[in-house]
Amino acid sequence: IDRSGSMAGVPLEEAKKSAAYIVSKMRDIDRLAIVTYDHNARVILPSQRVLNKAAINEVIFSITGGGSTDLHQGWLAGAEEVARNKSSNSLNRVLLLSDGNANSGETSAEVISSQCGQLADEGIITSTYGLGHHFNEQLMISMARTGLGQSYYGETADDLLDPFQEEFDLLINTFAWNLKL
C-alpha cells in the first residue's frame, strides 16, 4: 500500500478501503502480508493466515501518509513476503495499491517491470490497482503485464470493487482448474 505524500488524503483512504475489501474476500486458509511504503518500505503485517479480519483491518486503518515514493522498494518488500511462504499448492500474488508515481529509489518502468517478469517466471504474479487523479498508467500497466497479472484503475475503492471481485474469481477458478490437472 502506497502511503507516500502523493497518496495523502482521499487516495490513501480509498487504498485502505480497498485493502479492507480484499481482506473481506479472503478465507482463513489464505495468507496475507501488508507492506506500506513511502521513501521506506515497512512490513506492517508479516505473512500470516487470515484468521482475525478485525485485527487486520485495525492495522490497515492505522496507516498514515508519509514522504516520497519508493514504489520499487515497496513492491519488492511485498514480493519478498510472498516468496517466504511460496507454495506450489497456492497462488502467489502481489497486489499493489498505488498511484504509481515512483520518485525515489529505482524509478525506471523498464527495470521495475523486468523484475516483475522475473518474479512471474518464479511463480509470483503482480497485479496493480491504480488510485488517484495522477495515476502513472505506463508503470502500473507495464508491471502487471510483465508480471502476468491484471491492471486496474479507479478514483475510489468503489470503482475497484468489480475488478477486485474479478481478480478473486480468476484466482479461485485458476486454482480449481490447476487442481484438475
Which role fits each region the language model picked out?
Residues 1-180:
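Exposed acidic/Ser/Thr-rich ligand/metal-binding surfaces
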